[in-house]
Amino acid sequence: MTEQGGEALYQVAVRALCEFSAKRGDLDLRFTPSPSALEGIAGHTLVTSRRPAHYQREVALDGRYRHLQVRGRADGYDPQANCLEEIKTHRGDLALQPANHRHLHWAQARVYGWLLCAERKLEEVELALVYLEVGNQKETRFVERVRADELRLFFESQCQAFLAWAEQELAHRQRRDRELAALRFPHAEFRHGQRQLAEAVYKAASAGCCLMAQAPTGIGKTIGTLFPQLKAMPGQRLDRLFFLAAKTPGRALALHALRSLEGETGGLPVRVLELVARDKACEHPDKACHGESCPLAQGFYERLPAARAAAVEARWLDQARLREVALAHRVCPYYLGQELARWCDLAVGDYNYYFDLGAMLHGLAQVNQWRVAVLVDEAHNLVERGRRMYSAELDQGDFLGVRKTAPEALRKPLERIQRAWNELAKTQADDYQAYDEPPQKLLLALQNAVAAINDLLAEQPQALEPALQEFYFAILQFGRLAELFGEHSLFDIEKRPGRNGRSLARLCLRNVVPAAFLAERFAASRSTVLFSATLGPRDYYADLLGLPAGTPWLEVDSPFSSEQLEVHIQRRVSTRYAQRQASLAPIAAILGEQFRQRPGNYLAFFSSFDYLQQALDVFRQAYPWVPCWSQTRRMDEAERRAFLERFVAGGEGIGFAVLGGAFGEGIDLPGERLIGAFIATLGLPQVNPVNEQIRLRMQSLFGDGYDYTYLYPGLQKVVQAAGRVIRSRSDRGVVHLIDDRFAQAKVRRLLPGWWQLR
């Protein structure tokens, strides 16, 4: 939204206008390999490079229709031929292109055509759809010559179809900003430390900068960041706010906090959308995403306008409400959510919706030139999540399985991969080795395989079985990250025994410093606030996350006193691997004695499932009268919920869990639901060849290899787990840190300052 001469105008991109008004038919996601974004850019560059010197590229155009301001860049215009071109890249036989795609492309060309005629006072113009096949680089042209008055009528019809929506959006935005400016904090007063956090968030939003905020567990960080950021939206002319969480509980807390802001009138003026993974939203997982298979894909774009209108009217669109709206209009809930990401004010979702290489929210913000603010919940998780997002892996065992069943057309390209792979494995003497760069011969073989699969799919769009399609996606990701390879990543090969005495190799492009990728996402937002109870040391997170130089770091004062939490260091126990067997009986005695002194609910954390099980067996034998329950491998949501439901006020028992797992952070067990924790580990990552390579890279980049690789990540998990105990100023509890290394001065300095260690 903008103002011109005191009049409010709704700005819309040509592409967004046409996608709103000109899409029709079924949702059709039958897999065909579209060109990548980089291939699309290269294709546009190639086509325009073939044009004469007077050819004009990226022609900026805009026009008005009542309250609409329509803007965009036409791909190219030849003034001597009076020909405007809309360029699209594709693969394979163009005859296989769905008709609704061509219809949309013509709509874009005609809108650009009118904007050009209006600006240059042309009576007519030749419009050309130019399709470039990225494999053979051949152009196919579809041409029509259209009078300006015809184009004007088409432009006005598209705008008219969008106008009622735009006027509704203008009214919503004005009301939203007016009511957000008057938004009141939902509680009678701020908690201790919460006002300090809220003021810092508001200042960062107003200044348009990033903020790192370390705030103790239990002060209400979620509402303490959401409230000031919402208040800042009108003054900063923000279009969207993204609340990003690492795990499902973080999303749930955000939605709960937003509900509290509705007040007695239920009048929170923002449209809230919860984004969930496709597999959790799909109504027909046994069907393919196209109209011939799934009833919710058939006629999707015909039914979308009514579903979209009902959804924005509802405003509150968590997973349950969105599903209700979607099914009422017989459209797919997941893809309705994807569409509504364009029209919500506040999206709540996983990190990957903004930070992943192909992230949807980031892409929408860029295409629509939104001014956005980003809140990153439990931001200490972004280091490891970022590393995973920007890494890629290829497993030779999976590849051999794919090769056995692949179509004949792929036999030779896959053989080339196998030969290159085997050569790598033969030259490597050790089971694990890191290299300075990815192997060029293998990368070339992968590129050839991608081209061959593309050719196959261009002729047979449904030719890939699931395993081959998954491998195709894997080599695409591997190739993309190989192009971006730098000192932020490692390339390593790990060998393991296979059949017949042969070894199999796993190749990994392993990102270890996500800063280079994340920095661009921070730069794309007006303001980003990263908050967590464990966001220190400051330099560690600033270095690995790529925050702008000078990003302020806030440590919020703890509202809790040392009298609330007894912290005991058990100096006579070592949980090092070599001493684990000897540690089991002393650990059982510590747990049993604490439970005898003060019966209640406790959590006991261990470094692995094996260690947990050994400790549990010894404890049960020594204290059979103490109720116990334990975390198990690969628990589903129902099992995790059942584990937590054992922690009831007035209850007694000890839950055994793995440090860094589902119960070490992001759970809220206030009051008597949890009165203590035992942490029998420093949480240090395992010393292995991979982590040792990471340590060497951290040392060369930051001069602090051991701490960056082992100590800081480990103690972050310890502090998070201990933070489950004290959730309010009325709580009282105890934490036992079971390992002699907790007494080391270097380790003690990294523990919360308000703890009084005993």
List where the protein language model places each region.
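A contiguous, basic/glycine-rich beta-loop/short-helix subdomain that forms a polymer-engagement track
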Residues: 322-347, 357-365, 455-574, 582-583, ...
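A substrate-engagement module of RecA-like helicase motors
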Residues: 178, 184, 237-347, 352-355, ...
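Walker A/P-loop
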Residues: 206-228
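Mg2+/Mn2+-dependent nuclease catalytic core
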Residues: 61-155
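Conserved pre-motif I regulatory segment
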Residues: 172-214
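Metal-dependent nuclease catalytic cores that hydrolyze phosphodiester bonds in DNA/RNA
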Residues: 1-82, 107
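Conserved RecA-like P-loop NTPase helicase motor core
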Residues: 571-582, 632-742
